[in-house]
Amino acid sequence: AILQKPAADNGVLPLLSVDEASLSFTYSMADDDKVYGLGENVRGINKRGWIYQSKCSDEPEHLEDRRSLYGAHNFFVVTGKETFGIFVDYPGILTFDIGYTRYSELKITASDWNLDVYVITGTDVKDIVHQFRQLIGRSFVVPKWAFGYGQSRWSYMSEDEIRDVVKKHRELQIPLDSVY
C-alpha cells in the first residue's frame, strides 16, 4: 500500500524501456552493476544472474532453483553506472530476469498493465531506501520475543507433542522463545 501516492506521470519512465507487447520493462546493466532487494529469497545478496518471481509461496524445499519464497517484495536497488531503486506496486505475478537470459539486461515482466512503477533516484542507496520507506510507510517492528529462537515444523499433532518439544529443549539447555 502506498501512503501518499505521488501524482501520476504517464510519460516515459526514466532508465527503463517499455515493451507494451510483452508487458515488460527493461534496463541495460553495465558489467559491474549489482542488484539488491526483492525480499526473502534463496541465493546471494546480489540478485544478478538469476530469475525471481514475485508471488507468495511457502514451499517446503528451499532449493536454489526456487524463484519465489514466502512473500512478494517488489522493490530492488541497482548500484553501478547508475544508482536507483524500482518499486512495482502490483498484486499479480511479476518476473524479474536479472541478467539471467542476458547478463547485460534486467527485465521485469507482468501479466497485465494494472500496475504502478516507481523509479526512485537519490544520492545513495540509503537515500533511495529512505524515499521508498516514505512511500510505503514505516516497517513493522516485531515484539522482542520474536528475535529469539522459535522452533517450527510442518505439524504438531497434539498439545502433548508440543510440551515434549519444550521439555527436550530444556533438557538440552537450548534456549526457546516460541513454538509454532
Predicted regions and their residues:
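Aromatic-lined carbohydrate-binding/catalytic grooves of carbohydrate-active enzymes
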Residues: 140-180
